[in-house]
UniProtKB/Swiss-Prot annotation:
Gene3D superfamilies: Photosystem II CP47 reaction center protein. SUPFAM superfamilies: Photosystem II antenna protein-like. One of the components of the core complex of photosystem II (PSII). It binds chlorophyll and helps catalyze the primary light-induced photochemical processes of PSII. PSII is a light-driven water:plastoquinone oxidoreductase, using light energy to abstract electrons from H(2)O, generating O(2) and a proton gradient subsequently used for ATP formation. One of its GO terms (molecular function) is electron transporter, transferring electrons within the cyclic electron transport pathway of photosynthesis activity. PSII is composed of 1 copy each of membrane proteins PsbA, PsbB, PsbC, PsbD, PsbE, PsbF, PsbH, PsbI, PsbJ, PsbK, PsbL, PsbM, PsbT, PsbX, PsbY, PsbZ, Psb30/Ycf12, at least 3 peripheral proteins of the oxygen-evolving complex and a large number of cofactors. It forms dimeric complexes. It comes from Morus indica (Mulberry). The keyword Membrane applies. Binds multiple chlorophylls. PSII binds additional chlorophylls, carotenoids and specific lipids. It is found in: Plastid, Chloroplast thylakoid membrane. GO terms for biological process: photosynthetic electron transport in photosystem II. The chain crosses the membrane at residues 21-36, 101-115, 140-156, 203-218, 237-252, 457-472. This is Photosystem II CP47 reaction center protein.
Amino acid sequence: MGLPWYRVHTVVLNDPGRLISVHIMHTALVAGWAGSMALYELAVFDPSDPVLDPMWRQGMFVIPFMTRLGITNSWGGWSITGGTITNPGIWSYEGVAGAHIVFSGLCFLAAIWHWVYWDLEIFCDERTGKPSLDLPKIFGIHLFLSGVACFGFGAFHVTGLYGPGIWVSDPYGLTGRVQAVNPAWGVEGFDPFVPGGIASHHIAAGTLGILAGLFHLSVRPPQRLYKGLRMGNIETVLSSSIAAVFFAAFVVAGTMWYGSATTPIELFGPTRYQWDQGYFQQEIYRRVSAGLAENKSLSEAWSKIPEKLAFYDYIGNNPAKGGLFRAGSMDNGDGIAVGWLGHPIFRDKEGRELYVRRMPTFFETFPVVLVDGDGIVRADVPFRRAESKYSVEQVGVTVEFYGGELNGVSYSDPATVKKYARRAQLGEIFELDRATLKSDGVFRSSPRGWFTFGHASFALLFFFGHIWHGARTLFRDVFAGIDPDLDAQVEFGAFQKLGDPTTRRQVV
């Protein structure tokens, strides 16, 4: 046929059987990738430390999506929440991966069957004997079926009526587990961080989809609308389908990057805004203050802080710190977290408590500045010693640790104090193992960052595709120079231009 690479899809333009075939093959490829990727991730995943080395630190991409839908156990005998299990059941991580691969194989065979047996009676118009598709009817069927699936997911899977429920956690990502969720029918259901909204929105959207599907199955479009929107043209279907996909991609890019109940931080890592707003830092200070109010010592109050909460308050877990083109997991960047050293509290020789100013997200280097409770600069690590007046040595800064591995340890040696001041810029201080994975010390993004970048990029690409194919189908007559309602056969190329009234016509 000699088609250029960008026109190869025209081979299925008027061939419904093979159009189905290539779509089934596409589904086979997607399902096959998902299953294979899941098996690869399970082969390299280390479930031993869900607190300091969770799935998002290890760069897992498909495991979090399985987990948020209720899969927590492995045939390897481990659970994602820690500990061991004896009876994981068929729907383990490996079971889901295997199901995708089996489904992929069946789709592969179905695609071959439809490619070979492309000329089916069902595609033939009884009046003309030519292949044709009743696109408005097909739209109604698809809308109805997707509505049933949507309703079923919300009413049964999420609510636990027939299914496991979904991953639900507290606002600080400490108590996450799979549980049944009741639909939230009030205004709270519109809060993106309320899990009940997932159930209620799927039930509502599914109901709407079922009703809309039945409407499109029972009501034919008006002739003017049918012609105006080119409903008889398969490229109209392509254009509107691309619109649905790019819209969904933009939505999920937003819910992933800004955070929502559908993207728990225990599975995908914290968001950059939680670092920017000092979200975990405020909660840590609130808990310490509550401990002090109960007459606990500073050391006891800090020792009660969960290591998991302290780990979230570390800039290395900020997805915006990794460059888009730095390949590898977070563990390949700053290393595998081994333990929390504790919270450093700095004091000058007058006994004032000093706070290290934290590094903003988009800085690679940042001056070490220590301020008092009123925000007045009291100490720093100067760039030029000759002009320094707030240096650690001059001000006599000391550091003492509370909680963690160095609980109760204090340092007054200026070199050591400066070392911990630099590390305090990055949030809570952790011991990191960079030897095991030969980590290079350069921050990486989490799967939250990759997912957002990928979906935002493809959404922009698909937006262009929607405009392209929509314009092609709406203005087909303009681009081709042929009136779509032309009912006369014209001898092309025999005269100066198309539409010339002197052109010989043969009425059909």
